[in-house]
Amino acid sequence: MSLNVRTLDFWQIIVLALSILIFCPLIALILISFGDSEGLWGHLLETVLIRYVKTTLFLMAGVSLFSLLFGIISAWILTNYEFRFSKVLEVLMLLPLACPAYLVAYAYTDFFEYAGPVQGFIRGLMGWKTASDYIFPEIRSLGGAIFVLSSVLYPYIYLLSRTAFRETPNSYYEVAQLYNRNIFWSVSLPLARPAIVAGLALVCMEVVSDFGTVEYFALETLTLGIFNVWIGMNNINAAAQISTFTFIFILMLLLVEIRSRAGKRFNDTSSRQTNKKAKLITGIEAFFCIAGCLIPVSLGFFIPILILLSNALTSLNFHNYYEVTKIFTNTLIISSIGAFCIMGVSTIIACTAYLSGKKYLRTVANFSASGYAFPGTMLAIGILVFIGFVDRTLDLFSSADSTFYLSGTIFMLIFAYIVKFQAVGYGAVLSGLTKTSPNLIWASRTLGMSFHKTISRITIPLIKKSIIAGGVLAFVDIMKELPITLLLRPFDFETLATFTYQFAHDELMGKASVPALLIILVGLIPVIFLNKILRTNI
């Protein structure tokens, strides 16, 4: 059913304009990649580009392997077995989602490096004096990055695997047992494969997009290559060309994720559509199950938290806390403004596209939400180029001396957040709309209420909880965002993420720990929301 009303046509134009505006930075990025890189692209192709690709692929492969092991094993244990603390572990398994990978990297580097407590304890215990007396794995390495990213990203696979395992009807297991087949390999894993692949695609997108961890560990990935060429070599055209190359990686992963979601359907036509009951276990079996779940969550949450807390307590500095409070206020303000703008734009786009019933409008709306999949360094180039074009256009109609109207301002940073995180708000609003009965909306239209009044008086109150949830998620994502804020922030403007980054790079982990803990503390909010949703729906 469609709302073919003149007022709706106006809102359709608004949606098209907003979607095009959000997509403009990616278009600008592609256009500038055709510019002259002064021979640097050819030089990069001959020297480091292959290394960037290899490192990115090895990192993706390693993180994928360990994320699969952590996620699938823990999901299988908590779905099929019931033991003491199993319900608590279901909640704890999602906690690493609250920790940005770069903060975990900072914590583990401080913990495992030569001057850290682990190697110091080993040297004291064994009587060793120098680094040449023993061999210890280097945390700032490809293996270290795989370890850090896997411990933080496995919840994507855990969450989708657990949902798929729990939705498998018991009748499937009964048939497998009848034919004496292993239920995990013959039933659960094949049926959960689309969900697992979708989670794996999300993990790989996060790996490709990661900046903080790979930059701190000095790993030459595509994302860090974009940053180095742009900032280090001052060649934005060559950086855009690497970004376009990375664009292909992202599109392939998006295609895999979309195809996996499309195949994530199976039906039980029997009359008994009950789910398999968890088996009650005790003793040594329960011990190993608890250990299997505690290992990943400890690596991704508890150990980094304890390291950061220890650093914060051993370097108390009230002047530093005053500075942190000031920057925390900055972060709250910019995150609140960004979240408000994101939810406003998302609500307009999602409501109009969904209620119009027009396929092309929904397609455009979906494209406007694609920015979340792309690395922050890549989007920053596109946004800077696009805003620069807008500034030059405004300069043609202005008599002011300055040519920087929007560049280097809070407005540009807010716009960058909208481009990056609009998918978060759009997904939340769309989820609320699909759960709302359309009859109330059609009834209001039948009674003569205009489209915008229907949206404001009927639709928005019905999806208010979804809008709030989306706003909270967007707020936390903005608060944790590092590369976009670092590259596009106004002069002398700090957030908790950039503040932590500066201190970590100066090897001042005591000062970096307090803002890092604040980021993680706020990051727990969406995890709490997620657990409430899971308890309601599963």
List each model region and its residues.
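The alpha-helix within a helix-turn-helix
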Residues: 175-177, 444
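Feature of multi-pass inner-membrane transport and sensor proteins
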Residues: 122, 169-170, 219-223, 252-288, ...
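Glycine-rich helix-loop "coupling/hinge" segments at transmembrane-helix boundaries
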Residues: 208-234, 404, 482-509
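Short coil/turn motifs that cap or connect alpha-helices
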Residues: 182, 449-450
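Membrane-interface interhelical loops and short amphipathic "cap" helices
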Residues: 36-52, 215-217, 222-237, 312-324, ...
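Membrane-water interface segments at the C-terminal ends of transmembrane alpha-helices
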Residues: 6-36, 47-166, 191-211, 241-258, ...
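Short glycine/proline-centered loop/turn elements that form peptide/ligand docking sites
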Residues: 168-171, 436-440
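Short, charged juxtamembrane terminal tails flanking transmembrane helices
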Residues: 178, 532-538
